[in-house]
Swiss-Prot record:
PANTHER family registered for this protein in UniProt: ATPASES OF THE PP SUPERFAMILY-RELATED, TRNA-5-METHYLURIDINE(54) 2-SULFURTRANSFERASE
Keyword RNA-binding part of the UniProt annotation: yes
Protein name: tRNA-5-methyluridine(54) 2-sulfurtransferase
Highest rank taxon of the organism: Bacteria
Organism for this UniProt entry: Thermus thermophilus (strain ATCC BAA-163 / DSM 7039 / HB27)
Pathway annotation from the record: tRNA modification
Entry EC number(s): 2.8.1.15
Post-translational modification: Conjugated to TtuB via covalent linkages involving Lys-137, Lys-226 and Lys-229.
GO annotation, cellular component aspect: cytosolic tRNA wobble base thiouridylase complex
Amino acid sequence: MVCKVCGQKAQVEMRSRGLALCREHYLDWFVKETERAIRRHRMLLPGERVLVAVSGGKDSLALWDVLSRLGYQAVGLHIELGIGEYSKRSLEVTQAFARERGLELLVVDLKEAYGFGVPELARLSGRVACSACGLSKRYIINQVAVEEGFRVVATGHNLDDEAAVLFGNLLNPQEETLSRQGPVLPEKPGLAARVKPFYRFSEREVLSYTLLRGIRYLHEECPNAKGAKSLLYKEALNLVERSMPGAKLRFLDGFLEKIRPRLDVGEEVALRECERCGYPTTGAVCAFCRMWDAVYRRAKKRKLLPEEVSFRPRVKPLRAG
Protein backbone atom coordinates (compact mmCIF):
# COMPACT_ATOMS: atom_id res chain seq x y z
CA MET A 1 0.00 0.00 0.00
CA VAL A 2 1.64 3.23 -1.18
CA CYS A 3 0.77 6.92 -0.93
CA LYS A 4 -1.27 8.09 -3.91
CA VAL A 5 0.63 11.40 -3.95
CA CYS A 6 4.30 10.48 -3.53
CA GLY A 7 4.50 6.69 -3.85
CA GLN A 8 6.04 6.25 -0.41
CA LYS A 9 4.65 3.79 2.12
CA ALA A 10 1.11 4.79 3.09
CA GLN A 11 0.17 5.27 6.74
CA VAL A 12 -3.58 5.58 6.27
CA GLU A 13 -5.86 3.71 3.89
CA MET A 14 -9.39 5.05 3.32
CA ARG A 15 -11.41 2.39 1.53
CA SER A 16 -14.51 4.56 1.45
CA ARG A 17 -12.59 7.18 -0.54
CA GLY A 18 -10.34 4.88 -2.56
CA LEU A 19 -7.35 6.71 -1.14
CA ALA A 20 -4.14 5.86 0.71
CA LEU A 21 -1.68 8.47 1.97
CA CYS A 22 1.61 8.75 3.84
CA ARG A 23 1.84 10.71 7.08
CA GLU A 24 2.81 14.03 5.48
CA HIS A 25 0.19 13.94 2.76
CA TYR A 26 -2.54 12.61 5.05
CA LEU A 27 -2.08 15.53 7.44
CA ASP A 28 -2.11 17.96 4.50
CA TRP A 29 -5.21 16.31 3.04
CA PHE A 30 -7.05 16.42 6.37
CA VAL A 31 -6.42 20.13 6.89
CA LYS A 32 -7.36 20.98 3.29
CA GLU A 33 -10.58 18.95 3.50
CA THR A 34 -11.50 20.80 6.70
CA GLU A 35 -10.84 24.12 5.00
CA ARG A 36 -12.93 23.02 2.02
CA ALA A 37 -15.88 22.18 4.29
CA ILE A 38 -15.57 25.55 6.05
CA ARG A 39 -15.59 27.44 2.76
CA ARG A 40 -18.31 25.34 1.15
CA HIS A 41 -20.75 26.04 3.98
CA ARG A 42 -19.42 29.51 4.85
CA MET A 43 -18.86 28.41 8.41
CA LEU A 44 -16.21 30.95 9.34
CA LEU A 45 -14.77 34.22 8.08
CA PRO A 46 -11.01 34.30 7.35
CA GLY A 47 -9.06 34.60 10.61
CA GLU A 48 -12.28 34.81 12.63
CA ARG A 49 -12.35 34.43 16.40
CA VAL A 50 -14.12 31.12 17.10
CA LEU A 51 -15.04 29.33 20.33
CA VAL A 52 -14.16 25.62 20.19
CA ALA A 53 -16.01 23.31 22.57
CA VAL A 54 -13.27 20.98 23.88
CA SER A 55 -13.81 17.90 26.02
CA GLY A 56 -10.28 16.48 25.99
CA GLY A 57 -11.26 13.79 23.49
CA LYS A 58 -9.64 13.24 20.10
CA ASP A 59 -12.29 15.01 17.99
CA SER A 60 -12.41 18.33 19.82
CA LEU A 61 -8.63 18.56 20.31
CA ALA A 62 -8.01 17.70 16.65
CA LEU A 63 -10.49 20.41 15.63
CA TRP A 64 -8.82 22.98 17.87
CA ASP A 65 -5.46 22.02 16.35
CA VAL A 66 -6.68 22.26 12.73
CA LEU A 67 -8.50 25.57 13.19
CA SER A 68 -5.38 27.06 14.79
CA ARG A 69 -3.25 25.80 11.89
CA LEU A 70 -5.68 27.40 9.44
CA GLY A 71 -5.17 30.79 11.06
CA TYR A 72 -8.40 31.14 13.02
CA GLN A 73 -8.35 32.71 16.48
CA ALA A 74 -9.50 29.48 18.09
CA VAL A 75 -10.27 29.76 21.81
CA GLY A 76 -11.14 26.58 23.71
CA LEU A 77 -14.02 26.19 26.15
CA HIS A 78 -13.99 23.25 28.55
CA ILE A 79 -16.83 22.46 30.95
CA GLU A 80 -15.79 20.55 34.08
CA LEU A 81 -18.82 18.32 34.60
CA GLY A 82 -17.99 16.87 38.01
CA ILE A 83 -18.02 13.25 36.82
CA GLY A 84 -15.32 12.02 39.20
CA GLU A 85 -11.88 11.07 37.89
CA TYR A 86 -13.13 11.14 34.30
CA SER A 87 -13.76 14.89 34.47
CA LYS A 88 -10.48 15.55 36.28
CA ARG A 89 -8.50 13.75 33.58
CA SER A 90 -10.48 15.51 30.84
CA LEU A 91 -9.54 18.90 32.26
CA GLU A 92 -5.88 17.94 32.74
CA VAL A 93 -5.54 16.76 29.12
CA THR A 94 -7.26 19.89 27.79
CA GLN A 95 -5.12 22.23 29.89
CA ALA A 96 -1.93 20.45 28.80
CA PHE A 97 -2.93 20.76 25.13
CA ALA A 98 -3.57 24.51 25.49
CA ARG A 99 -0.42 25.12 27.52
CA GLU A 100 1.88 23.28 25.10
CA ARG A 101 0.55 25.30 22.13
CA GLY A 102 0.07 28.66 23.79
CA LEU A 103 -3.68 28.62 23.15
CA GLU A 104 -6.34 30.44 25.16
CA LEU A 105 -8.62 28.19 27.20
CA LEU A 106 -11.79 29.11 29.08
CA VAL A 107 -13.10 26.78 31.79
CA VAL A 108 -16.50 26.58 33.46
CA ASP A 109 -16.80 24.29 36.48
CA LEU A 110 -20.42 23.13 36.68
CA LYS A 111 -20.26 22.38 40.41
CA GLU A 112 -18.61 25.69 41.27
CA ALA A 113 -21.05 27.62 39.10
CA TYR A 114 -24.29 25.94 40.18
CA GLY A 115 -23.50 23.80 43.20
CA PHE A 116 -23.84 20.37 41.62
CA GLY A 117 -22.01 18.21 39.09
CA VAL A 118 -23.72 15.92 36.59
CA PRO A 119 -24.25 12.93 38.94
CA GLU A 120 -26.09 15.07 41.53
CA LEU A 121 -27.84 17.05 38.80
CA ALA A 122 -29.25 13.87 37.27
CA ARG A 123 -30.55 12.60 40.63
CA LEU A 124 -32.12 15.91 41.63
CA SER A 125 -33.61 16.73 38.23
CA GLY A 126 -35.07 13.27 37.60
CA ARG A 127 -33.47 13.29 34.15
CA VAL A 128 -31.17 10.73 32.59
CA ALA A 129 -27.58 11.89 33.11
CA CYS A 130 -26.93 12.43 29.38
CA SER A 131 -30.07 14.57 29.07
CA ALA A 132 -29.24 16.79 32.06
CA CYS A 133 -25.61 17.05 30.98
CA GLY A 134 -26.43 17.82 27.34
CA LEU A 135 -28.92 20.54 28.24
CA SER A 136 -26.42 22.17 30.59
CA LYS A 137 -23.54 22.01 28.10
CA ARG A 138 -25.56 23.49 25.23
CA TYR A 139 -26.76 26.36 27.40
CA ILE A 140 -23.38 27.16 28.94
CA ILE A 141 -21.52 26.97 25.63
CA ASN A 142 -23.97 29.38 24.03
CA GLN A 143 -23.98 31.74 27.01
CA VAL A 144 -20.18 31.93 27.10
CA ALA A 145 -20.03 32.45 23.32
CA VAL A 146 -22.54 35.29 23.37
CA GLU A 147 -21.18 37.05 26.45
CA GLU A 148 -17.54 36.69 25.42
CA GLY A 149 -18.27 38.13 21.98
CA PHE A 150 -18.00 35.04 19.75
CA ARG A 151 -20.21 34.89 16.67
CA VAL A 152 -19.71 31.16 16.22
CA VAL A 153 -19.08 27.95 18.16
CA ALA A 154 -17.26 25.02 16.53
CA THR A 155 -17.75 21.43 17.71
CA GLY A 156 -15.87 18.25 16.81
CA HIS A 157 -18.85 16.17 15.67
CA ASN A 158 -17.68 13.70 13.02
CA LEU A 159 -19.38 11.63 10.32
CA ASP A 160 -20.11 8.74 12.69
CA ASP A 161 -21.79 11.12 15.14
CA GLU A 162 -23.86 12.86 12.47
CA ALA A 163 -24.91 9.65 10.70
CA ALA A 164 -25.99 8.12 14.03
CA VAL A 165 -28.06 11.20 14.90
CA LEU A 166 -29.70 11.11 11.47
CA PHE A 167 -30.41 7.39 11.84
CA GLY A 168 -32.10 8.01 15.19
CA ASN A 169 -34.06 10.99 13.88
CA LEU A 170 -35.36 8.94 10.95
CA LEU A 171 -36.52 6.19 13.32
CA ASN A 172 -38.56 8.84 15.17
CA PRO A 173 -39.09 11.42 12.41
CA GLN A 174 -39.99 15.00 13.21
CA GLU A 175 -39.65 17.50 10.39
CA GLU A 176 -38.49 20.35 12.61
CA THR A 177 -35.68 18.23 14.08
CA LEU A 178 -34.62 16.87 10.68
CA SER A 179 -34.64 20.34 9.14
CA ARG A 180 -32.11 21.50 11.75
CA GLN A 181 -29.63 18.69 11.12
CA GLY A 182 -26.61 19.82 9.20
CA PRO A 183 -23.08 21.20 9.47
CA VAL A 184 -24.26 24.76 10.20
CA LEU A 185 -26.89 26.28 12.48
CA PRO A 186 -27.06 30.00 11.70
CA GLU A 187 -26.66 32.78 14.23
CA LYS A 188 -29.79 34.31 15.76
CA PRO A 189 -30.30 37.02 18.40
CA GLY A 190 -29.03 35.51 21.64
CA LEU A 191 -27.84 32.33 19.89
CA ALA A 192 -24.31 31.90 18.52
CA ALA A 193 -23.94 30.06 15.21
CA ARG A 194 -22.92 26.38 15.47
CA VAL A 195 -20.59 24.74 12.95
CA LYS A 196 -19.22 21.21 12.53
CA PRO A 197 -16.13 21.34 10.27
CA PHE A 198 -15.43 17.58 10.74
CA TYR A 199 -18.90 16.39 9.70
CA ARG A 200 -17.58 14.45 6.67
CA PHE A 201 -14.64 12.77 8.43
CA SER A 202 -15.14 9.31 9.88
CA GLU A 203 -14.13 8.66 13.48
CA ARG A 204 -11.20 6.61 12.19
CA GLU A 205 -10.03 9.48 9.97
CA VAL A 206 -10.08 11.91 12.90
CA LEU A 207 -8.25 9.37 15.06
CA SER A 208 -5.60 8.94 12.35
CA TYR A 209 -5.00 12.70 12.26
CA THR A 210 -4.79 12.85 16.06
CA LEU A 211 -2.25 10.02 16.25
CA LEU A 212 -0.12 11.24 13.34
CA ARG A 213 -0.01 14.75 14.84
CA GLY A 214 1.05 13.32 18.20
CA ILE A 215 -1.90 14.85 20.03
CA ARG A 216 -2.38 13.46 23.53
CA TYR A 217 -6.06 12.98 24.25
CA LEU A 218 -8.36 11.28 26.76
CA HIS A 219 -8.97 7.74 25.51
CA GLU A 220 -11.78 6.73 27.84
CA GLU A 221 -15.45 7.36 27.12
CA CYS A 222 -17.74 9.13 29.56
CA PRO A 223 -19.01 6.52 32.06
CA ASN A 224 -22.55 7.83 31.57
CA ALA A 225 -22.47 6.97 27.84
CA LYS A 226 -22.84 3.24 28.50
CA GLY A 227 -26.13 2.00 27.05
CA ALA A 228 -26.79 5.17 25.04
CA LYS A 229 -28.91 4.61 21.93
CA SER A 230 -26.38 6.52 19.84
CA LEU A 231 -23.87 3.71 20.42
CA LEU A 232 -26.37 1.17 19.10
CA TYR A 233 -26.98 3.33 16.02
CA LYS A 234 -23.24 3.62 15.41
CA GLU A 235 -22.82 -0.14 15.72
CA ALA A 236 -25.58 -0.73 13.16
CA LEU A 237 -24.07 1.78 10.72
CA ASN A 238 -20.59 0.29 11.18
CA LEU A 239 -22.00 -3.10 10.22
CA VAL A 240 -23.31 -1.62 6.97
CA GLU A 241 -20.07 0.29 6.37
CA ARG A 242 -17.98 -2.88 6.61
CA SER A 243 -19.91 -4.43 3.73
CA MET A 244 -20.45 -1.19 1.80
CA PRO A 245 -17.49 1.20 2.23
CA GLY A 246 -18.65 4.81 2.01
CA ALA A 247 -22.24 4.00 3.03
CA LYS A 248 -22.24 6.42 5.99
CA LEU A 249 -20.97 9.30 3.89
CA ARG A 250 -23.51 8.60 1.14
CA PHE A 251 -26.27 8.33 3.76
CA LEU A 252 -25.48 11.72 5.28
CA ASP A 253 -24.66 13.51 2.02
CA GLY A 254 -27.81 12.14 0.39
CA PHE A 255 -29.96 13.49 3.19
CA LEU A 256 -28.29 16.91 3.24
CA GLU A 257 -28.35 17.34 -0.54
CA LYS A 258 -31.64 15.73 -1.56
CA ILE A 259 -34.01 15.47 1.40
CA ARG A 260 -33.28 18.30 3.80
CA PRO A 261 -33.87 21.06 1.19
CA ARG A 262 -37.38 19.67 0.64
CA LEU A 263 -38.39 19.76 4.28
CA ASP A 264 -40.98 22.45 4.84
CA VAL A 265 -41.46 23.20 8.51
CA GLY A 266 -43.68 26.21 7.82
CA GLU A 267 -43.19 29.28 9.94
CA GLU A 268 -40.27 29.23 12.36
CA VAL A 269 -41.15 28.79 16.00
CA ALA A 270 -41.30 32.22 17.62
CA LEU A 271 -38.63 32.78 20.25
CA ARG A 272 -38.89 35.05 23.25
CA GLU A 273 -36.61 35.99 26.12
CA CYS A 274 -36.56 33.65 29.11
CA GLU A 275 -37.96 35.42 32.17
CA ARG A 276 -35.11 34.04 34.29
CA CYS A 277 -32.00 34.43 32.15
CA GLY A 278 -32.98 36.47 29.11
CA TYR A 279 -31.83 33.90 26.56
CA PRO A 280 -34.08 32.72 23.69
CA THR A 281 -36.79 30.17 24.44
CA THR A 282 -40.21 29.16 23.16
CA GLY A 283 -41.94 29.46 26.54
CA ALA A 284 -41.89 31.80 29.50
CA VAL A 285 -38.88 30.07 31.10
CA CYS A 286 -36.22 28.11 29.19
CA ALA A 287 -35.60 24.40 29.79
CA PHE A 288 -32.23 25.08 31.44
CA CYS A 289 -33.67 27.46 34.02
CA ARG A 290 -36.69 25.21 34.65
CA MET A 291 -34.42 22.25 35.29
CA TRP A 292 -32.10 24.10 37.65
CA ASP A 293 -34.95 25.83 39.49
CA ALA A 294 -36.43 22.37 40.15
CA VAL A 295 -33.03 21.06 41.25
CA TYR A 296 -32.63 23.88 43.77
CA ARG A 297 -36.13 23.34 45.18
CA ARG A 298 -35.50 19.62 45.68
CA ALA A 299 -32.03 20.22 47.08
CA LYS A 300 -33.47 22.58 49.71
CA LYS A 301 -36.11 20.04 50.70
CA ARG A 302 -33.35 17.48 51.21
CA LYS A 303 -31.27 20.01 53.19
CA LEU A 304 -28.53 19.97 50.55
CA LEU A 305 -28.75 23.74 50.13
CA PRO A 306 -29.66 26.52 52.58
CA GLU A 307 -33.03 28.19 52.02
CA GLU A 308 -31.51 31.58 51.21
CA VAL A 309 -29.56 30.26 48.18
CA SER A 310 -31.20 30.87 44.81
CA PHE A 311 -30.34 29.67 41.32
CA ARG A 312 -28.46 32.23 39.21
CA PRO A 313 -28.16 31.34 35.50
CA ARG A 314 -25.11 33.46 34.65
CA VAL A 315 -21.61 31.95 34.68
CA LYS A 316 -18.23 33.60 34.22
CA PRO A 317 -15.57 31.34 32.70
CA LEU A 318 -12.06 31.21 34.12
CA ARG A 319 -9.11 31.71 31.77
CA ALA A 320 -6.93 28.67 32.28
CA GLY A 321 -4.44 28.88 29.46
